[in-house]
Swiss-Prot record:
Its cofactor is Mn(2+). Homotrimer. It is an enzyme of class 3 (hydrolase). It comes from the Eukaryota. Mn(2+) 1 binds at residues 120, 143, 147, 251. Gene3D superfamilies: Ureohydrolase domain (3.40.800.10). The gene is ARG2. The keyword Manganese applies. Residues 330-354 are annotated as: Disordered. This is Arginase-2, mitochondrial. May play a role in the regulation of extra-urea cycle arginine metabolism and also in down-regulation of nitric oxide synthesis. Extrahepatic arginase functions to regulate L-arginine bioavailability to nitric oxid synthase (NOS). Arginine metabolism is a critical regulator of innate and adaptive immune responses. Seems to be involved in negative regulation of the survival capacity of activated T cells. May suppress inflammation-related signaling in asthmatic airway epithelium. May play a role in promoting prenatal immune suppression. Signal peptide: none annotated. Mn(2+) 2 binds at residues 143, 145, 251, 253. Residues 1-22 form a transit peptide.
C-alpha cells in the first residue's frame, strides 16, 4: 500500500471515530393504495418518492434503516358502495387493517415509522397501528383539508376525506360501522390532535371542529400569527404538560400547487416551502417524532415529468427535515473536531490535503 493511501486511510478512520451516530432508527413502509378516492395514480406515490432518493437521503443523515418495501394489499373482488355513496369501504378497511399490523410491528421494534402513500385514508391504519404501542400519542395533521367528514356528512363518498372521523373518540356515536371497518377502535381524543394549514374545509367539518373544540390553524391563522407562534401553541397544547409520541400526518397538498402540483386535490393559497419545512424541523427538534405519513403524491396528475419529480422531491425534503435535515444543510453531527495526534501526522495530513 502506498504512503498516500496509508495516510488517507488513517485520516478516514480518525474522522469516523469522532462522528456522532444518529439516534434515529427509521422504518420505511410503502403503501401503494388509491381506493380511498377515485383518481388513479396515487398508488404510484411510494415508487416516485423512492425514486426521488428517500432511502439514500435518510441513510446520509445517519439513520439506521429498516425498509419494509411496498406492501401488497389483499384485493377485494366485489366492493359495493355503502349507502349508495361511500367508495370501496371493504378495500379501505382491509388495507388499513393490514397496514396497522405492519406499523405496529415497526414501532414496537423501536423504529420511527415512515409510511409513504398512497391516499390519506391510510392514516386510519397508520394511527391505529401506532396507537396500539403508543396509546398516549398525539397527532399533528398538516393538510389543506380537515379529512374529518363522516360517512353521513361526506358529499364525495371518498374515504380519504374521512379518516379522522373513524379515529376520534368523540365521534364514535356519529359514525356508522362500514363493511370492513369492524376492527377499528377510536384511539385519539380531540385535545390530542392539531391541524395546521387548513384552507378548504367543508361546512360539516367546520361544525365538528368547533363543536368538539379541536385546535386548528388555517392558512389565515398562519399568516396572522406566524409559523413560529403556531408551532409554539401546537406544542404547548400537545406536549406542554406531558412528553408523548408525535404522529405527523402530512398531505403534500398542504403546499401551494406551484410547489407540489402532482396531487389529487390541490388548492391555491397553500404554504410556501419555508413554512412547511419549519413545521417538520420543529417536530424533529422535540425528539418525540414516532411516526410520519407522507401521502397524496400522484405522479399521473402532473402536467410534465418535471412536475412529478418536483413533487416527489418535495416529499423527500419533508421526510428528511423530520429526521434532522435543516436548511443549513443536513450534516452528520460532530462531537468534536479530530485533533492531530502528533506534529508528524499533522504534517502528513496537510500534504494529503494539498
Amino acid at each position: 500500500m502506498s504512503y498516500g493511501s496509508c495516510v488517507s486511510r488513517l485520516l478516514r478512520t480518525r474522522v469516523q471515530s469522532v462522528l456522532k451516530k444518529s439516534v434515529h432508527s427509521v422504518a420505511v413502509i410503502g403503501a401503494p393504495f388509491s381506493q380511498g378516492q377515485k383518481r388513479k395514480g396515487v398508488e404510484c406515490g411510494p415508487a416516485a418518492i423512492r425514486d426521488a432518493g428517500l432511502v439514500k437521503r435518510l441513510s446520509d443523515l445517519g439513520c439506521r434503516l429498516k425498509d419494509y418495501g411496498d406492501l401488497s394489499f389483499t384485493p377485494v373482488p366485489k366492493d359495493d358502495l355503502y349507502n349508495n355513496l361511500i367508495v370501496n369501504p371493504r378495500s379501505v378497511g382491509l388495507a388499513n387493517q393490514e397496514l396497522a399490523e405492519v406499523v405496529n410491528r415497526a414501532v414496537s421494534g423501536g423504529y420511527s415509522c415512515v409510511t409513504v402513500g398512497g391516499d390519506h385514508s391510510l392514516a386510519i391504519g397508520t394511527i391505529s397501528g401506532h396507537a396500539r404501542h403508543c396509546p398516549d400519542l398525539c397527532v399533528v395533521w398538516v393538510d389543506a383539508h380537515a379529512d374529518i367528514n363522516t360517512p353521513l356528512t361526506t358529499s364525495s363518498g371518498n374515504l380519504h376525506g374521512q379518516p379522522v372521523s373513524f379515529l376520534l373518540r368523540e365521534l364514535q356515536d356519529k359514525v356508522p360501522q362500514l363493511p370492513g371497518f369492524s376492527w377499528i377502535k377510536p384511539c385519539i381524543s380531540s385535545p390530542s390532535i392539531v391541524y395546521i394549514g387548513l384552507r378548504d374545509v367543508d361546512p360539516p367539518e367546520h361544525f365538528i371542529l368547533k363543536k368538539y373544540d379541536i385546535q386548528y390553524f388555517s392558512m389565515r391563522d398562519i399568516d396572522r400569527l406566524g409559523i413560529q407562534k403556531v408551532m409554539e401553541q401546537t406544542f404547548d397544547l400537545l406536549i406542554g404538560k406531558k412528553q408523548r409520541p408525535i404522529h405527523l400526518s402530512f398531505d403534500i397538498d398542504a403546499f401551494d400547487p406551484t410547489l407540489a402540483p402532482a396531487t389529487g386535490t390541490p388548492g391555491c393559497g397553500g404554504a410556501d416551502l419555508s413554512r412547511r419545512m419549519y413545521i417538520s424541523e420543529e417536530i424533529h427538534n422535540t425528539g418525540l417524532l414516532s411516526a410520519l405519513d407522507l401521502v397524496e403524491v400522484n405522479p399521473r396528475l402532473a402536467a410534465s415529468d418535471e412536475e412529478a419529480k418536483a413533487t416527489a422531491s418535495l416529499a423527500v425534503d419533508v421526510i428528511a427535515s423530520s429526521f434532522g435535515q435543516t436548511r443549513e444543510g443536513g450534516h452528520t453531527v460532530y462531537e468534536q473536531l479530530p485533533p492531530p495526534s502528533s506534529p508528524h501526522e499533522s504534517e502528513n495530513a496537510e500534504r494529503v490535503r494539498i
